[in-house]
Design a protein with these regions (language model features):
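Histidine-dependent nucleotide/RNA phosphoesterase domain, centered on the 2H-phosphoesterase fold
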Residues: 1-183
Length: 183
């Protein structure tokens, strides 16, 4: 029931990454399915707590996205956060892009200009959560090769619905899950 703006890994890339890490976690881990691997740009709260509907947020996101260019970068290593959630230690894949901080700040500034009250509990660390594991061991690593990735679209996830806005001067669209749970 959450709302976020995110960059989703292209499915073929996500499936390749998932093949490298899915067997590295024990059964107590909550592993992110390949079709849900994403880099969160903004978390906007819960659908039950917002005055904005998906249509309004997507209209704004599309307006912003038309003025942006695709983001280039690379997958660049695996890490963990020190905070522990009820599911365990978050283990993530990093995404390195010199363009990403300004891109994300532009999005923050744009949504604030529309009147959204955005609150941040910590700084922006670009990451793609692979799993939450209660049994994390120091020194444990997953070897994910550096891979160039260009994100050409940004996604508004509003509950279970995904709305996709192309970066640059293209139209966006609404996406639903198929029978296998893929978008």
């Amino acid at each position: 029931t959450g709302i976020m703006v995110a960059l989703f890994l292209p499915l073929v890339v996500a499936q390749g990454v998932a093949a490298l890490y899915r067997d590295q976690f024990d059964l107590s881990a909550t592993v992110t399915p390949a079709n849900e691997l994403h880099l969160t740009l903004l978390y906007l709260g819960d659908t039950s707590e917002t005055e904005y509907d998906a249509g309004q947020l997507f209209e704004w996101l599309s307006e912003w996205a038309r003025e942006q260019q695709p983001i280039n970068g690379k997958l660049n290593g695996v890490g963990k956060f020190n905070s522990v959630s009820p599911e365990g230690v978050p283990v993530y894949l990093s995404y390195d892009s010199p363009e990403l901080p300004a891109f994300r700040q532009s999005l923050v500034d744009f949504f604030r200009s529309k009147g959204l009250q955005l609150e941040f509990n910590h700084g922006f660390t670009p990451h793609i959560t692979l799993a939450y594991t209660p049994n994390y061991k120091d020194g444990w690593l997953i070897d994910v090769p550096q891979q160039e990735i260009t994100f050409g679209e940004v996604v508004l996830a509003y509950g279970d619905a995904h709305f996709v806005a192309s970066l640059g001067n293209q139209s966006g669209f609404f996406v639903t899950k198929d029978a296998q749970g893929n978008y």
